[in-house]
């Protein structure tokens, strides 16, 4: 799915009036991610999480590829629509955890999102698994959320 297709997803139309969006990105795609937020009608607020990756088999830091420096972290940015409420001011930004399957994000991030925002309805787009308490949409899961589109590239 190209960036224009992602920007065209009706996420902003389906989102609650007051809600938060957490978007995982790699550093080289930062500008495109901000374009997506804007296209969906959200305002960038901060970096919610910095995932410092550890190797699968030990606690050493993972060393990935990189354009300038060797990447070993990913970020999850936080954007809002309206005025969502934060329910826990003690949620920390840095997540230090081991990498798992390709592109799988740490479960701890979902747990922190629930702590931060409360036990409210939530959906994971481009999901790779179906975590309890979350609706999911993507081509690697059985979708429980549906995006009305002329042509649905992921769940069609």
Where are these regions (language model features)?
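Class I S-adenosyl-L-methionine-dependent methyltransferase catalytic core
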Residues: 1-156
């Amino acid at each position: 799915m190209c960036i224009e297709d992602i920007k065209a997803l009706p996420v902003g139309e389906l989102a609650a009036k007051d809600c938060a969006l957490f978007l995982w990105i790699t550093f080289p795609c930062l500008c495109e991610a901000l374009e997506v937020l804007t296209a969906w009608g959200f305002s960038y607020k901060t970096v919610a999480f910095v995932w410092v990756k550890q190797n699968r088999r030990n606690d050493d830091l993972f060393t990935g590829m990189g354009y300038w420096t060797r990447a070993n972290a990913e970020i999850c940015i936080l954007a809002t629509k309206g005025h969502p409420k934060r329910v826990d001011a003690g949620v920390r930004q840095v997540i230090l955890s081991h990498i798992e399957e390709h592109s799988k994000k740490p479960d701890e991030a979902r747990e922190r999102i629930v702590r931060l925002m409360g036990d409210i309805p939530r959906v994971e787009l481009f999901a790779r698994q179906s975590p309890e308490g979350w609706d999911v949409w993507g081509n690697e899961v059985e979708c429980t959320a549906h995006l009305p589109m002329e042509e649905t590239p992921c769940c069609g």
